[in-house]
């Protein structure tokens, strides 16, 4: 009896919501709202549009630091093993290499968005 009552309530609620959705006024559709927008590029135009090399370099730098975080996240679990010296030295080497690379980018003005 409980299963039949639950099914009946679900069907009634579903039909009520569907009928209310049909009776509500439809919103106005503007062409700007209906068009897809992908990261500032028009998807209907040519896909061979050039973009700034600065944008590319900052994107690659972001991906490198994202990868660094992904590589450093399991370090607390790796600290539980007996070879803790190897884990900390590897993590320190990774952070040092990425810090030196960031300093090199910064000194060569690779992170300057406008010149």
UniProtKB/Swiss-Prot annotation:
Enzymatic class: translocase
Protein name per its UniProtKB record: NADH-ubiquinone oxidoreductase chain 3
Pfam families hit by this protein: Oxidored_q4 (PF00507)
Record GO cellular component, one term: NADH dehydrogenase complex
GO molecular function: NADH dehydrogenase (ubiquinone) activity
Primary localization: mitochondrion
Subcellular location: Mitochondrion inner membrane
Organism of this sequence: Calomys callosus
Subunit-level organization: Core subunit of respiratory chain NADH dehydrogenase (Complex I) which is composed of 45 different subunits. Interacts with TMEM186. Interacts with TMEM242.
Gene Ontology biological process terms in this record: mitochondrial electron transport, NADH to ubiquinone
Alphabetic keyword roster: Electron transport, Membrane, Mitochondrion, Mitochondrion inner membrane, NAD, Respiratory chain, Translocase, Transmembrane, Transmembrane helix, Transport, Ubiquinone
Topology with respect to the bilayer: Multi-pass membrane protein
EC number: 7.1.1.2
Catalyzed chemical reaction(s): a ubiquinone + NADH + 5 H(+)(in) = a ubiquinol + NAD(+) + 4 H(+)(out)
Annotated function: Core subunit of the mitochondrial membrane respiratory chain NADH dehydrogenase (Complex I) which catalyzes electron transfer from NADH through the respiratory chain, using ubiquinone as an electron acceptor. Essential for the catalytic activity of complex I.
Membrane spanning stretches: 4-24, 55-75, 87-107
Gene, per the UniProt record: MT-ND3
């Amino acid at each position: 009896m409980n299963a039949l009552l639950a099914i009946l309530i679900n069907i009634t609620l579903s039909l009520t919501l569907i009928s209310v959705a049909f009776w509500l006024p439809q919103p106005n559709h503007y062409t700007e709202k209906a068009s897809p927008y992908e990261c500032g590029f028009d998807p209907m135009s040519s896909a061979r549009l050039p973009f700034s090399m600065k944008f590319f370099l900052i994107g690659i730098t972001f991906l490198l630091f994202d990868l660094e975080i992904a590589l450093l996240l399991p370090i607390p679990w790796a600290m539980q093993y007996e070879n803790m010296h190897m884990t900390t030295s590897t993590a320190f080497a990774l952070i040092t290499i990425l810090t030196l690379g960031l300093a090199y980018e910064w000194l060569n003005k690779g992170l300057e968005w406008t010149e």
